[in-house]
Every structure is written in C-alpha cells, then in structure tokens.
A protein has these predicted regions:
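Ligand-binding loop in jelly-roll beta-barrel domains
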Residues: 162-176
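A generic structural micro-feature
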Residues: 80, 100-104, 169-173
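A short coil-to-beta-strand element that immediately follows conserved catalytic motifs
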Residues: 75-86
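Hydrophobic residues positioned within well-ordered beta-strands of beta-sheet architectures
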Residues: 1, 84-86, 106-108, 175-179
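Catalytic core of non-heme Fe(II) oxygenases with the double-stranded beta-helix
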Residues: 85-156, 166, 184-192
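Non-heme Fe(II)/2-oxoglutarate
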Residues: 1-75, 96
C-alpha cells in the first residue's frame, strides 16, 4: 500500500532541520547519531526517535492515523496500532542499506527527499541467492522488485518482507523516515 503524505513540504522541512542539527553536532553540542553498525550503511537517528524529537512524534502520530483509517476502511483485524520504533536515515554518496527485514506486523518508509539520487528501494521475494549462467542468453529469475517512488511517497508493507536500498549515486543527500508498527489487541475483545 502506498500514498502521498499530506503536508509533505511541512514534514520535509521539519526532518531536514533535525538532520541539519545532527550534521552540525559540534556547533549545537547535540547529536543522536549512533556509532554501532547495523543494516543502514548511512547516517541515522536512534530507533526511538519519536521520543527524542517532537517533530518526529507528530509525524508518527499523523502516519498512524492514516494507517488506522486504512485498516478500518479495508476491515483488517487490527484494533490498535502502536509504534515499535522509528528513525531517520540520510544517505550521502555511496551510502546504502543492506537487505533486511524487521519482523513486525507493518513497516513504513516515508520518502522525504529521494529523487535524483539514483538510489532504488528494493523488495526481495526471499533471502536466497541464485546463480546465473555465464552464457549471454540465459533465463533470469526475478527475486527482486524495484519500487519507484517520488518525494512524499509513503510505503506500508509487511515488516517480514526483505527490503534494502541501493547506493546513492549522487552528491544529493537521500532522506527517509522509517517506522515499525505492531498490532495490539484490547484485553477484552468486543466481537469476533
């Protein structure tokens, strides 16, 4: 499922301001950029960025409302959606994200500033690698799906899907927001 984020220009400005602070940590004497390695081979904020930045919390609440409206409209059995974690990624030239999954009910990626970077968002059908024949004319299997997105696009997908990002080929910073959501059930269900 995908949609265009309402108020994209507002959110883009808010997120870019956070990244500006992160990029100038010596001046501001504040940074949440982490040192430990993960699948994101770029700069990112911590997984709990909704607790650290009011703008990220507001954005997250707006996104959850859109997801809840979609779930209600489509009649999915998901009475309560909770944020598990969210963070910002910014990719400089040659930065990328290795294929991975999150093991949650829903994952979201909000593409804030991605156009003209040459980087592609990819879904993989599985975690297997395949061998290809050396001959010129050989059969190819399609285990990878490239998703073309524009600035302002939000993708919502099963958190178990393997996905990744190819390297940023430009000098322009590629910026995304990512979140993992879980379904929760009330203690007492009203109906089945």
């Amino acid at each position: 499922y995908s949609f265009m984020m309402p108020n994209h220009e507002h959110w883009s400005k808010e997120i870019k301001n956070i990244i500006l602070v992160e990029e100038n940590k010596d001046i501001h004497k504040h940074s949440t950029v982490l040192d430990e390695a993960c699948n994101v081979k770029a700069k990112r904020t911590p997984w709990d960025s909704h607790y650290r930045y009011p703008a990220v919390l507001s954005l997250t609440k707006d996104l959850i409302k859109i997801v809840e409206d979609f779930i209600k409209k489509e009649d999915f059995d998901a009475p309560l959606i909770k944020i598990e974690e969210c963070w910002l990624n910014w990719y400089n030239k040659d930065n990328y994200t290795t294929p991975h999954n999150h093991g949650v009910h829903l994952s979201l990626v909000y593409f804030i500033d991605v156009e003209d970077t040459g980087a592609k968002f990819l879904f993989s059908k599985n975690n297997c690698y395949s061998l290809e024949k050396k001959e010129k004319n050989h059969t190819r299997c399609n285990n990878v799906r490239e998703v073309n997105v524009k600035n302002g696009t939000v993708l919502m997908f099963n958190g178990n899907l393997t996905h990744g990002v190819t390297p940023n080929l430009s000098d322009q910073t590629r910026i995304t927001y990512a979140a993992n959501l879980v379904v929760q059930y009330m203690e007492k269900r009203e109906d089945y």
